[in-house]
Amino acid sequence: MWREIVLKYSIMENKKSLSQIEQDLINFWDKEKIFEKFLKNNLSRAKAEKKTFSFFDGPPFASGSPHYGHIMVSFIKDAVLKYWSLRGFSVEQTFGWDCHGLPVELYVEKKIGIKSKKDIFKLGENEYKSIEKFNEICKNSVFDCIDEWHQMFKRIGRWGDFKNAYSTMDNKYI
C-alpha cells in the first residue's frame, strides 16, 4: 500500500499540486478507513496484552479558528498517541470540545458586533427571547468552530475518534 502511494506521487511524474495530493491522501484515509483499521488492530492486540496508556487531552475551546499554536500542540499530542499505540498499548483517542460560556460568548459578541450586554436584549422581542436567541447563536457558533477544527485535524493527519467526541455542553457529559 505505501509503495503504491509513493509510486503514484513520484516527483518526476506528479503534475498535481501539493494541496491536491493532500486532499487525495485524506480521501484515501477516509475511504479505506485507515484510522478505524489502525484502532481496531491496536485495541485487539493491546487487550490481549492488557496494556493501556492514558492520555488526557485538554479539549480546545470551540470559540474560534485554530491557529499556529494549536497546530503545533496537535502535532506533539498526535506523535505521543501514535508512539504509544505503535508500542502495543491501547490508547483512547476520543476528542472533546470545551464549549463553556465565556470564550464562546466573547467570540460571538465580537462576530455579531455586540458592544454591551444591552445589545443582547435587542436581539429578540423581550429579554427572555433575546437571551434565548443569543444562546442559540452561541450554540450554532460552537458547531461551526468544531467543523473547522475537524477539517484542520484531518489536514495535519491527526487521528482521533471524532464520531464519539464529547462536548461540555452535552447533557451526557454534564
Q: At which residue positions do the language-model features occur?
A:
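N-terminal, positively charged nucleic-acid-binding surface of large information/translation enzymes
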Residues: W2-I174
